[in-house]
Amino acid sequence: MTAVNVALIRDTKWLTLEVCREFQRGTCSRADADCKFAHPPRVCHVENGRVVACFDSLKGRCTRENCKYLHPPPHLKTQLEINGRNNLIQQKTAAAMFAQQMQLMLQNAQMSSLGSFPMTPSIPANPPMAFNPYIPHPGMGLVPAELVPNTPVLIPGNPPLAMPGAVGPKLMRSDKLEVCREFQRGNCTRGENDCRYAHPTDASMIEASDNTVTICMDYIKGRCSREKCKYFHPPAHLQARLKAAHHQMNHSAASAMALQPGTLQLIPKRSALEKPNGATPVFNPTVFHCQQALTNLQLPQPAFIPAGPILCMAPASNIVPMMHGATPTTVSAATTPATSVPFAAPTTGNQLKF
């Protein structure tokens, strides 16, 4: 995680005191130590009816002879100290909020950069490079979806995402037990002290919604004194199971509290791309930067010969058109008969199909 340190800037607003207007007129009957407003001397700088107190004076270390800041009396000094503590709390709160916002911005930037890889290889501008056999097919690097583990991936710094359709293991509740269905039918061969399910003697204990009974926690602690308790009193082997389940729940809660929020979050597996022709679904992993590097690599190219039948035209002049991507070549007058030239046309027409 990136730590963001914000320097605390000294703010002089909390050091500002209002000047007594009666003192400015020379009619204030209260002394400096009694008036709730400031009585600054002439050397102090007063602006808009306010004066700034001397910070060094609050610490008891001002050595200036004619200080332009106010040296407040004890009662105003106490007020300024309270203002200073409140201002420090506000600055720390603002710094913490700023650091949290910066952390969220960094996390969003990291997540947005994951989806910025090109999805298709770039085709070079050179025509022969368009038929480059070294350009990887867009389907290269695709992994079948069944080879990807179904377990979620843990990565740092991402906001937690919901996992639709993910069902975790069913945890045993520490205050309820499932009733034995065989016992309800009257054909349970296991005894009350051997069956892993509850054998309640009173049918009113059973909750019809989930077929469970509520455990009497006082009985487990050995202090149930009710004659007809409406809760189930489990045998010893079921008590051991309940205590183990309770311990497991406490351990899981402690482990969850140990993780910092935002450190490890679950993200779902990337959804597969369904093929319309019924082929195996695939997904695109983050290998496109390697694919892009191979695409931009300039390699020597072999001559391109298109597949299928080739249609040739008889030359009408001394310019013979060559294959795609090559430059036209000027040839001299033919010294051999036209029938020996591979591109010559027969007498029946000017087209020849190989």
From Swiss-Prot:
Pfam family, one: zf-CCCH_4
GO biological process: mRNA processing; negative regulation of myoblast differentiation; regulation of RNA splicing; RNA splicing
Top-level taxonomic group: Eukaryota
Keywords attached to this entry: Cytoplasm, Developmental protein, Metal-binding, mRNA processing, mRNA splicing, Nucleus, Repeat, Zinc, Zinc-finger
Subcellular compartments: Nucleus; Cytoplasm
Tissue: Highly expressed in the placenta.
Annotated GO MF terms: RNA binding; zinc ion binding
GO annotation, cellular component aspect: cytoplasm; cytosol; nucleoplasm
Annotated zinc fingers (C3H1-type), start-end: 14-42, 48-74, 174-202, 210-236
Membrane-spanning intervals of the chain: none
InterPro entries, A to Z: Znf-CCCH_4, Znf-CCCH_Muscleblind-like, Znf_CCCH
Reported function: Mediates pre-mRNA alternative splicing regulation. Acts either as activator or repressor of splicing on specific pre-mRNA targets. Inhibits cardiac troponin-T (TNNT2) pre-mRNA exon inclusion but induces insulin receptor (IR) pre-mRNA exon inclusion in muscle. Antagonizes the alternative splicing activity pattern of CELF proteins. May play a role in myotonic dystrophy pathophysiology (DM). Could inhibit terminal muscle differentiation, acting at approximately the time of myogenin induction.
Family according to the record: Belongs to the muscleblind family.
Protein name, UniProt field: Muscleblind-like protein 3
Organism: Homo sapiens
Taxonomy of the source species: Eukaryota, Metazoa, Chordata, Craniata, Vertebrata
